[in-house]
């Protein structure tokens, strides 16, 4: 994948290690999930997943409980909005936001793009077709081994639940399926009693591009600004 990819991955991991930034994003996901489907994780799969992802980032239980309670307060008045943009070198950007003030959010995003020559926000729907939406689950390889399952066994067991692709990455196993199969795949993990490390819906570029180190470094400046915004909970690009 090249040095540019490694640079991008290392930079992203470093940013997401800033707990002061990641916790507010995780809390918003929990609050919105509780608002949409109720505050009981046992009956709200979306909330279960949001809590799971928060625990994976070592978010304290008190923070999780506070985020759930916030769903019934004025602070819980959040909405999900997606924005799209283009940058230099053919880079396409999709930004998923959770906000209580869409006017503030779009104004901030426009300011980041305006500070980057050649970058701009584009009308929603302009880039949607350039990305596939997928359900993505992560689990630990040793958890699969603890269940006396091979990777082939796991793949066979989850096919009926919507699995499309299984990939081994280090000590983790990545499971991908159709966007609409998220709930079904979640049920598949539960039926196997296989702990989920992380889960979510992701956008995967249909035609990824590669940038050289210089191009990546310039692009990172814009991506940093976007990801540092508390209203942005997910950022997707077509960078390989």
From Swiss-Prot:
Family classification: Belongs to the TACO1 family.
Classification via Pfam families: TACO1_YebC_N, Transcrip_reg
- Keywords assigned: Cytoplasm, DNA-binding, Transcription, Transcription regulation
Tell me if Acetylation is a UniProt keyword of this record: no
Q: What is this protein called?
A: Probable transcriptional regulatory protein HPAG1_0159
This protein's superkingdom? Bacteria
Disulphide bonds annotated for this chain are: none
List GO terms (cellular component aspect). cytosol
Q: Where does this polypeptide localize?
A: Cytoplasm
What GO molecular functions are on record for this protein? DNA binding
